[in-house]
Amino acid sequence: GHNKKDKKMQKK
């Protein structure tokens, strides 16, 4: 998803 929280949870 394209959410503001998704950008912060991009720890792959």
Curated annotation (Swiss-Prot):
GO molecular function: rRNA binding
Protein name per UniProt: Small ribosomal subunit protein uS19
Protein origin, superkingdom: Bacteria
Keyword line: Ribonucleoprotein, Ribosomal protein, RNA-binding, rRNA-binding
Any single Gene Ontology cellular-component annotation: ribosome
Species in which this protein is naturally found: Tomato big bud phytoplasma
Keyword hit for Glycosyltransferase: no
KW Ribonucleoprotein (keyword) present: yes
Function: Protein S19 forms a complex with S13 that binds strongly to the 16S ribosomal RNA.
Coiled-coil intervals, chain numbering: none
Family statement: Belongs to the universal ribosomal protein uS19 family.
